[in-house]
């Protein structure tokens, strides 16, 4: 049974690839939320100088910056999913990919930094999550290429 031929088959294939990219971005954004939550919990429980380290202003500001990055990535992921078969869907997907690259890398790196040395150990799930975030970043492909496509309009 032939499902589609010619240009219709090519369009269906492009849509399937775009849907897979949206799925990978969504996986990364969801996992990044888990990493942020685990990091926030660690900052609430880890104590230094008689208080939770999350009370230190510099660390609170870093977490706020990461929350903003996550929200931007999540919003663009939703937009890409909703515009998957729209005329400007490919451009929105490229924007979502670029933002996902930026957010996943920053959230992963900061989570390890905020956890300190223990963040790199297999004892904490965060280390495994961060490895998956980096793998998703590679699976998505080059952010510079997506940015160039986006800029070309």
Q: PLM features: what roles do these ranges have?
A:
Residues 1-18:
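A short, charged helix-loop
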Residues 16-153:
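Alpha-helical interface subdomain recognition
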């Amino acid at each position: 049974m032939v499902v589609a031929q010619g240009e219709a088959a090519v369009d269906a294939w492009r849509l399937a690839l775009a849907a897979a990219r949206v799925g990978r971005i969504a996986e990364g954004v969801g996992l990044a939320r888990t990493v942020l939550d685990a990091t926030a919990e660690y900052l609430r429980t880890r104590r230094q100088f008689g208080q939770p380290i999350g009370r230190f202003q510099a660390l609170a500001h870093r977490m706020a910056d990461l929350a903003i990055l996550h929200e931007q990535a999540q919003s663009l992921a939703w937009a890409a999913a909703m515009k998957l078969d729209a005329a400007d869907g490919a451009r929105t997907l490229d924007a979502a990919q670029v933002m996902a690259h930026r957010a996943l890398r920053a959230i992963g790196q900061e989570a390890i930094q905020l956890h300190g040395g223990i963040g790199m150990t297999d004892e904490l799930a965060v280390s495994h999550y961060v490895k998956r975030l980096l793998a998703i970043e590679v699976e998505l492909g080059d952010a510079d290429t997506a940015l160039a496509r986006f800029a070309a309009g």
